[in-house]
């Protein structure tokens, strides 16, 4: 009977020792490996783990009176602080402040928003007969989606000016010939001639306005307005439509 009680006592004591050691290890590790304390260097973690494991291997047993005062690593005391010594609490507080400042200033790749400019080729789609644009749907245009301007060479401009001198309007066949000759597209030549005609009309209108001048002669009763010839210069032949009138034999 005594042997059984002795074995039971040894078993219970060994079991209690393991429980106490494990509990002390958990409490010790919990204090130093809390979420705030994880911000410190790995050498401190290894040192604490080795010290705690060496103490457990030696068979050190905590006093049960001390275990009664041990609190959960994440439990809070009345004043709102963890049940740790002031040095560890100060270190943990500094680590928390450091981690908070680092996380607040750190920018991850997913936080950087990149807006790629959207390019729309609506004109090309309309020319190709795309159903989306042929139905008359509204197209949102961006400032960056404007068509690039074509820089004509001096030889191309010379040929275009010579052709404009003979005729301000070109038929489609002549435009295709010019496009093949100057290595341009039919659309580019068509737009160039449109702009050139508008420029010519604007210059012609300014010249005709400058020719018409008025002279005001001031008198006591009423001013006398004398105007010079305000007749516009005749329209150039290339802007006129020449139609052959049939001769009438009487």
Curated annotation (Swiss-Prot):
Gene Ontology MF: a single term: RNA polymerase II cis-regulatory region sequence-specific DNA binding
Keywords, alphabetical: Developmental protein, DNA-binding, Homeobox, Nucleus
Swiss-Prot/TrEMBL GO biological process terms: anterior/posterior pattern specification; embryonic skeletal system morphogenesis; regulation of transcription by RNA polymerase II
Localization of this protein: Nucleus
Annotated region of DNA binding: 145-204
SMART domains: HOX
GO cellular component, one term: nucleus
Span(s) of short sequence motif Antp-type hexapeptide: 107-112
Stored InterPro entries: HD (IPR001356), HD_metazoa (IPR020479), Homeobox_CS (IPR017970), Homeodomain-like_sf (IPR009057)
Pfam families on file: Homeodomain
Primary role: Sequence-specific transcription factor which is part of a developmental regulatory system that provides cells with specific positional identities on the anterior-posterior axis.
Family: Belongs to the Antp homeobox family.
Protein name: Homeobox protein Hox-C3a
Lineage start: Eukaryota, Metazoa, Chordata, Craniata, Vertebrata
């Amino acid at each position: 009977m005594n042997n059984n009680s002795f074995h039971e006592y040894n078993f219970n004591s060994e079991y209690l020792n393991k429980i106490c050691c494990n509990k002390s290890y958990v409490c010790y590790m919990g204090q130093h490996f809390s979420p705030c304390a994880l911000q410190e260097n790995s050498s401190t973690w290894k040192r604490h783990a080795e010290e705690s494991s060496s103490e457990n291997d030696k068979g050190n047993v905590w006093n049960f009176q001390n275990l009664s005062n041990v609190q959960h690593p994440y439990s809070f005391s009345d004043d709102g602080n963890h049940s740790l010594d002031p040095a560890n609490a100060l270190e943990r507080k500094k680590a928390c402040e450091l981690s908070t400042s680092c996380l607040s200033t750190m920018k991850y790749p997913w936080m950087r928003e990149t807006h790629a400019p959207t390019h729309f080729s609506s004109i090309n789609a309309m020319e190709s007969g795309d159903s989306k644009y042929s139905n008359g749907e509204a197209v949102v245009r961006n400032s960056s989606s404007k068509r690039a301007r074509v820089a004509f060479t001096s030889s191309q401009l010379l040929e275009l000016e010579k052709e404009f001198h003979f005729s301000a309007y070109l038929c489609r066949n002549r435009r295709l010939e010019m496009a093949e000759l100057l290595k341009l597209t039919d659309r580019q030549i068509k737009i160039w001639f449109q702009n050139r005609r508008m420029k010519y009309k604007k210059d012609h209108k300014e010249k005709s306005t400058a020719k018409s001048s008025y002279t005001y002669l001031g008198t006591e009763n009423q001013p006398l307005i004398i105007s010079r010839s305000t007749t516009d210069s005749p329209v150039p032949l290339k802007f006129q439509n020449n139609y052959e009138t049939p001769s009438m034999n009487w």
